[in-house]
């Protein structure tokens, strides 16, 4: 974040500065806090399914993390295009983006080489774009509440059937007891996905390793980009 501010002070183009300070830097701050909350609410040592509200907190922060991860790359692209007065040359606002050919052909060699690597290409296409697009436009990212063995699944179904049989009978204490037992069954799920119908495009990913890896990627790219963004091709 501080590096974005420092680099913005070296230029006098207000629109470019805004994308660094109020765009990328602000997003990085949100990502840092979201990452912290994910690990606070859902420690790796968790051995019981999370309560529903806690799981929602984790999902909210996962959503914030992923949408801003995508946005950081967009903000860097805008800062670069505006700094070098390339908006018309790239074809207008819809062609601004670190992963869009019209913008990439003007990037410094070091930045382009990094983005064009096999690792980054796969990361962007199979993960970042897929999961961000689903989150923004289709199905939000989801952490299943628990994993059940066959026996646990059968017990859960028995309890659920009894709950339905009590509907309208005002037996609230029994309903609460059934719900409490259901919540205690199973083990936590440490994966996330979006759609259940999109196959490989929504393959389950390990939550904690993924957000750590993403954080490393955006920090690494940020240092590389800010070291070279005064150059253009």
Features from the language model and the residues they span:
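Acidic, Ser/Thr/Gly/Pro-rich intrinsically disordered interaction regions
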Residues: 1-33, 37, 47-60, 77-233
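Active-site gating/metal-coordination segments in enzymes
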Residues: 43
């Amino acid at each position: 974040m501080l590096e974005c501010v420092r680099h913005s002070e070296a230029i006098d183009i207000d629109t470019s500065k805004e994308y660094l300070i109020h765009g990328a830097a602000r997003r990085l701050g949100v990502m840092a806090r979201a990452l912290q909350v994910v690990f606070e609410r859902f420690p790796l040592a968790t051995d019981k399914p999370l309560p529903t509200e806690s799981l929602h907190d984790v999902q909210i922060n996962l959503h914030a993390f992923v949408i801003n991860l995508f946005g950081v790359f967009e903000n860097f692209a805008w800062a670069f295009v505006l700094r070098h007065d390339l908006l018309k040359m790239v074809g207008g606002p819809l062609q601004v983006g670190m992963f869009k050919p019209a913008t990439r052909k003007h990037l410094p060699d070091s930045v382009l080489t990094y983005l064009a690597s096999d690792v980054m290409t796969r990361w962007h296409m199979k993960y970042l774009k897929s999961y961000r697009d689903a989150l923004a436009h289709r199905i939000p990212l989801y952490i299943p509440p628990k994993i059940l063995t066959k026996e646990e699944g059968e017990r859960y179904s028995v309890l659920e059937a009894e709950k339905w049989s009590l509907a309208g009978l005002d037996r609230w204490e029994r309903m609460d007891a059934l719900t409490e037992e259901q919540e205690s069954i199973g083990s936590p799920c440490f994966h996330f996905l979006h759609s259940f119908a999109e196959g490989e495009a929504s393959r389950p990913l390990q939550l904690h390793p993924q957000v750590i890896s993403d954080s490393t990627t955006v920090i690494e790219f940020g240092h590389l980009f800010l070291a070279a963004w005064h150059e253009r091709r």
